């Protein structure tokens, strides 16, 4: 059962009001557009001809576009079936929404920040000698995402978000120079209050503290003046992509990253946001399963740069120079663990699907097993093919999904993928105790990932995300062991699921799947 409080209900109501008035304003704009079309009825023939020509041009462009068919096919169907509506929606939504100025800002910031990271070509060469099975993935990340691979980094794995929070609070309280925190959602309640108390103490001790959060992700959790409250406490605070009452399809691109950096020495990432439900303070969907990792050592540099990218690109005017030297200071650290660590970030503003490509590469490289855990399973044909092909090669491919959903319509789409995967040998497990929000993968006791990237369209194509690729290190075995515990708590989906669905449900799920990439 969901646990409600007056404070939580009030914040939800405030968020609903903001969403309502924004949606109302957008609806009025849409009504106005329809009204204008009806007033132009005398030019109907010319409008239909123009729209039809434009529809053909767009369909040809989509057909030749370098993008997965799972993303282009729904648009082609919509444009051909309903030309006026399809063309209008595509021009508003399908062009990936981000204004040219926004893309230019990110490109400018990246051109200043990413070259500050070391190339570490010698480490990559060492990786090819020690773990060639994983080295190709690291090469891909270094060349295409521009995030290098590191050694000399200790990794601690937390199989529960609450354990990660306690460690995080301890490290935050020891910060000497700076604290960077970037999260999709912050809830102004007990869990955040504990963090806020530590941050305020650190500010008073002279530590620079920055907090960056996504407006849509936090809209039902905090008041609108939250950032102002933080500024009054001395905490520098910025909001990513505020919800506005106007057509702006960049609103579809959210900051889903979850990063904490402390003094450039320690970093945290994982699946959890800074809200009570992630730490099982409340139980809206049964037991909440989330995970995280702590990095200490050289690899922290990449998460520092990833944070500064979003922080600086969110400014309307990018500074001519971004001095990061004070945040990338060298310090002597000798890691106790060995292995290869590679933090990385993904952006919807380029043509590189980094998160999906890493997952596909792991499935392709796996020889014995490749396991995933995700809260949502809404994948492209390419991802589906990689998983089923691995299973056909004899690889033990498994995916864990939630037993209790947080979004029932999305859960219905998730379940619609079960049959096509199961019948080709992929094993699907439903974690019965509650909602698994963790986003991880592990293969062959050699490589693993932990981060924010779900196996769904929004994470793989629409959101700003981050992850950490790890190879030949102790944490890979810890993640594997956690998967084994989760399998023991889960129910396996069999082919009987296919016969257990009514024709009406199958039809509904098929339609939702077809247009899932447009959501």
Regions found by a protein language model. Give the residues of each.
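Catalytic-core elements of nucleic-acid end-processing and repair enzymes
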Residues: 439
């Amino acid at each position: 059962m969901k646990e409600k409080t007056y404070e939580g209900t009030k914040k939800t109501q405030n968020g609903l009001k903001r969403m309502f008035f924004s949606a109302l304003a957008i609806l009025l704009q849409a009504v106005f557009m329809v009204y204008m079309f009806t007033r132009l009825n005398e030019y109907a023939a010319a409008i239909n001809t123009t729209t039809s020509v434009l529809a053909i041009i767009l369909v040809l462009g989509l057909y030749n576009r370098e993008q997965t068919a799972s993303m282009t096919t729904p648009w082609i169907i919509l444009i051909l079936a309903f030309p006026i509506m399809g063309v209008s929606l595509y021009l508003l939504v399908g062009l990936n929404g981000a204004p040219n100025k926004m893309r230019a800002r990110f490109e400018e910031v990246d051109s200043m920040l990413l070259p500050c990271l070391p190339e570490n070509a010698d480490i990559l060469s060492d990786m090819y000698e020690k773990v060639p099975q994983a080295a190709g993935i690291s090469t891909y990340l270094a060349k295409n995402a521009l995030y290098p691979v590191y050694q000399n980094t200790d990794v601690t794995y937390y199989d529960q978000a609450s354990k990660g929070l306690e460690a995080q609070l301890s490290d935050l309280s020891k910060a000497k120079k700076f604290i960077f925190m970037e999260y999709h959602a912050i809830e102004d309640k007990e869990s955040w209050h504990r963090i806020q108390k530590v941050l305020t103490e650190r500010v008073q001790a002279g530590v620079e503290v920055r907090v960056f959060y996504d407006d849509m992700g936090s809209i039902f959790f905090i008041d609108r003046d939250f950032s102002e409250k933080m500024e009054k406490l001395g905490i520098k605070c910025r909001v990513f992509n505020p919800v506005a009452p106007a057509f702006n399809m960049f609103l579809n691109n959210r900051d889903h990253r979850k990063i904490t950096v402390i003094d450039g020495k320690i970093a945290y990432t994982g699946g959890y946001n800074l809200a009570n439900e992630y730490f099982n303070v409340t139980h809206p969907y049964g037991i909440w399963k989330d995970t995280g990792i702590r990095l200490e050592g050289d690899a922290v540099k990449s998460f520092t740069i990833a944070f500064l990218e979003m922080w600086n690109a969110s400014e309307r005017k990018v500074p001519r120079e971004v001095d990061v030297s004070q945040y990338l200071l060298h310090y002597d650290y000798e890691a106790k663990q060995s292995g290869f660590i590679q933090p990385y970030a993904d952006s919807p503003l380029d043509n590189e699907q980094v998160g999906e490509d890493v997952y596909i590469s792991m499935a392709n490289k796996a020889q014995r097993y490749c396991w995933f855990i995700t809260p949502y399973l809404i994948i492209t044909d390419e991802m589906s093919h990689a998983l089923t092909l691995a299973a056909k090669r004899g690889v033990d491919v498994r995916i864990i999904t939630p037993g209790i959903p947080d979004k029932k319509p999305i859960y219905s789409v998730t379940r619609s993928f079960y049959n096509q995967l199961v019948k080709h040998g992929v094993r699907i497990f439903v974690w019965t105790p509650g909602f698994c929000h963790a986003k991880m993968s592990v293969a062959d006791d050699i490589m693993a990932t932990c981060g924010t990237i779900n196996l769904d369209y929004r994470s793989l194509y629409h959101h700003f995300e981050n992850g950490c690729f790890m190879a030949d290190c102790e944490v890979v075995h810890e993640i594997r062991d956690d998967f084994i515990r989760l399998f023991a708590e889960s129910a396996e989906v069999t082919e009987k699921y296919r016969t257990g669905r009514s024709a009406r449900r199958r039809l509904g799920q098929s339609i939702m799947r077809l247009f899932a990439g447009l959501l």
